[in-house]
Amino acid sequence: MNVNINSLRPLTGSGRKLYIETYGCQMNVGDSEIVVSIMQQEGFRYTESLEEADIVLINTCSIRDNAEQRIWGRLSEMRHMRKKKPSLIIGIIGCMAERLKEELTKGGTGVDIVAGPDSYRDLPRLVREVDGGATGVNVELSKEETYAEIAPVRLDKNGVSAFIAIMRGCNNYCSYCVVPYTRGIERSRDAETIIAEARTLFENGYREVTLLGQNVNSYRTGEVDFPELLKRVAEISPLLRVRFATSHPKDISDKLLETMASMPNICKAIHLPAQSGSTEMLKRMNRKYTREWYLERVEAIRRYMPDCAITTDLIAGFAHETEEEHEATLSLMQEVGYDFAYMFKYSERPGTFAQRNLGDDIPEDVKTRRLTEIIELQNRLSEESNKRDIGKEFEILVECTSKRSDAQLSGRTSQNKMVVFDRGNHQIGDYVKVRITGCSSATLFGEVII
C-alpha cells in the first residue's frame, strides 16, 4: 500500500498564530489571501492581532525606494518585538524578497524567512527550516505558477468586494520598472477556475469582483482572451459588478470596449496608466505607444462609453526629462481630463534598463516641483469631474459605514467614485439609487432616491 509521508507528519502550524501585513498593489492583497489559505491548510490560525502572532509575514513592494524603506523600518520594529517574544518568526515575502534576498538574509536583519511571489506553496516547509534552526529561503521564479486551485481566504471583512488574480508576471519591460524581475514572465490562469471563483463569491453574497493582473489586456488561455473572460464573468449574474486592473494602453482593444459597453454590470471605469504625455519620454520608458496612440484610445473609450471614468499613473522627473516633456504631461492631463491619478516622483530601481543605461539625472528639487504641479492640476481636474456629477443619479453598491458618521453609508458608482449618503434602512451589499448633491475633490455626497 502506498502511503503519503506528508499525510503522516504533524501539521507545521499546530495551532500557531499567523499575522500578515500587506504593502503595495492590489495583487499583493490577493497574494496575502492566498498565503493565508496555504498556511491554514498547514494548521496555522490567522490572527488580526500582531501581539498574538507566533509568525509574522510582511508582503512587500519594490516599485519605489520609499516602499522598501518602509519595510526596513518595520523590520526594526519587529526586532524590538522579538525581545519580548524570542520565538517570534519573521518572514519577508513578495517582491522585496525576490529583489533583495542577499541583503535580507544577512545577519542582524532579524529575518527568518524570505519567499518570492512564486514560492508561497513552499512557506510551510520554510517554517520547518526555521524550526530546525536554519533560515528558510525560496525566491525561485516560475513559468507556470498561478495558484489557480487555491481558494483565497478573504481578509477584507466587508463581504461585498473581492479581488481575483487572473494572471501573474509581466512581459512589457518598461525601462523604469522592476516588476518583470520580481514577478517573472506573464502567465494566464485557467479561465474556468476564474469563473468558478467569481461564481462562488457571488453565491456567498459578494456583489463585486475586480479581475487583477499586471496587464489584464494580455490575458489569454486557449481561445479565451480578456474581453471574452470579462464577458463570461459578467454573465454570472447582472447583480455582480465586474471591475479590472490594470490595463496597458497599447493593448486596449475595440473588442474590450464593445464588451464593456454592452454589459451594464461591467463597471464603466478604466485605469489607463500614461506615465508621461511626451512621445519622446514614452520611448525612453519603453512604453510601446505614442501620445497620439494614447489619445486615440481615450477617444475610443469616450466613443463607446461617454460616461466612462478614466484614471491614470504619472511619473515626474524620469531620466532626462525636459521642461517641455513635463509640460507635455500637464497638457495631456488637461486634454484627457482624468477623474483621478496616482502621481509619483521617479524612483530609480536597481537592475532596470533605466538604471543601467539612462541614469537618474533630474535634481530632487526639480522632481518635487514638477510633481507638485501635476498634483495641483489633478486636484482641480478631480474636483471639476466631481462637480459635473452634481444633479446626476447613480446606482451605488453599498460597501461600508461612512468614516464620517455611523448614520451614513458609503459606496461607489460604476465609475469608481466614492459616494457618502444617509443610511436610512439600507444595508451593506445593497444597491441604492442616489442623486448627487455636492462634492469635494475626492468624494461625492448624495441623497437616496426613494
Residue ranges and their predicted role:
Residues A354-I450:
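Terminal RNA-binding accessory module
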Residues T22, T47, R284, A341, ...:
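Thr-Gly-centered strand-to-loop micro-motif
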Residues I90-G94, R99, L104, E203-E324, ...:
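Conserved SAM/AdoMet-binding glycine-rich loop
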Residues D156-V160, C170-N172, I266, S276, ...:
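Short flexible coil/turn linkers enriched for glycine and charged/polar residues
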Residues C174, I194, L211, F244, ...:
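Conserved, mostly hydrophobic/aromatic
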Residues M1-N217, K255, I270, E292-R303, ...:
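Proteins enriched for Cys/Gly/acidic motifs involved in redox and nucleic-acid/cofactor modification
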Residues R121, N172, N217, T279-E280, ...:
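Glycine-centered loop/turn positions within well-structured domains
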